[in-house]
Amino acid sequence: MDWLYSLIYGIVEGITEFLPISSTGHLILTGNLLHVPWPKEVKDTFEVVIQGGAILAVLVYYWRDFLKIRHIGHDRGQQRLWLGVVLACIPAVILGVLFGDTIKAYLFRPSVVAWALIVGGVLMWLLESRKATPDTHDIENISAGKALAIGAAQCLALLWPGFSRSASSILGGMLLGLDRPTATKFSFYLGVPTLGGAALLDFIKSREILAQIGVVNVAIGAVTSFVVAYFAIGWLLRFVSTNNFKGFAVYRVVVGVLILVLIARGVLQNGSLA
């Protein structure tokens, strides 16, 4: 059955990693509702490592764009873009190094994740209800100041598990004047170093833990995550070009309430997830 659990985890990760609905919240539901019999440390490490598949999907989807980095020496747009990505990563790196263990110890609880989903959904609805005219329509035109601010917004997902890294970075970008497609694309780019670094570090540190379920099952999860995420990226980009995020806002609230109901009924334990 391990292969089936790996497949399901990969599907859930691939769908939810880049959509603003919290992969953390959905992986919690998946693991608990399916009663996955893996030790907790295996489950936690597996969930992080298969993010590598989703990150690879971004690299493949945008491979032509990423190749433009070859011209960074004389292309001002590429210089602005990658300076922005580096600056946007700084707040998350600092926060993760200083407080990562504390956050995992005290904040990774289903109830915390549920309220993050609900509050994030409400904020998403309110942001989409305001009348504002975006002033940035290309990721190469994002200023250094805006990039750093988006990186700070992304930290909300670290401080409040379940808020969603993609949601916090996309909403932060929109609040700063990026249009939806531009904010979404920059969030994808930002996820490469942020999530890729975490996945690689966990893989290096925890190879012995992952050995408990075998390299084949890890590969199944990562490959499935890659394939599903690739199509999820394309779908989301098409969606945001003509739609707003209010549907995601409602969905987040529904999932958050569902988690709270499951906790109240004893189906889902509210102990620490870290």
Curated annotation (Swiss-Prot):
What remark does the entry add?
Bacitracin is thought to be involved in the inhibition of peptidoglycan synthesis by sequestering undecaprenyl diphosphate, thereby reducing the pool of lipid carrier available.
Q: Name one GO biological process term.
A: peptidoglycan biosynthetic process
Locate the transmembrane regions by residue number.
1-21, 42-62, 81-101, 107-127, 142-162, 184-204, 213-233, 248-268
What is the gene called? uppP
Protein name as catalogued = Undecaprenyl-diphosphatase
Q: Which InterPro entries does the record associate with it?
A: UppP
Q: Where in the cell is it found?
A: Cell membrane
* Protein family (similarity comment): Belongs to the UppP family.
Single GO cellular component term: plasma membrane
Q: Where is the signal peptide?
A: none
Gene Ontology terms, MF aspect: undecaprenyl-diphosphatase activity
What HAMAP family does the record point to? Undec_diphosphatase
Tell me what topology the record assigns in the membrane.
Answer: Multi-pass membrane protein
Question: Which reaction is this enzyme known to catalyze?
Answer: di-trans,octa-cis-undecaprenyl diphosphate + H2O = di-trans,octa-cis-undecaprenyl phosphate + phosphate + H(+)
**Presence of the UniProt keyword Cell membrane in the record:** yes
Q: What does this protein do?
A: Catalyzes the dephosphorylation of undecaprenyl diphosphate (UPP). Confers resistance to bacitracin.
- Enzyme nomenclature, EC number: 3.6.1.27
Q: What is the lineage of its organism?
A: Bacteria, Thermotogati, Deinococcota, Deinococci, Deinococcales
Keywords, comma-separated and alphabetical: Antibiotic resistance, Cell membrane, Cell shape, Cell wall biogenesis/degradation, Hydrolase, Membrane, Peptidoglycan synthesis, Transmembrane, Transmembrane helix
Pfam families, A to Z: BacA
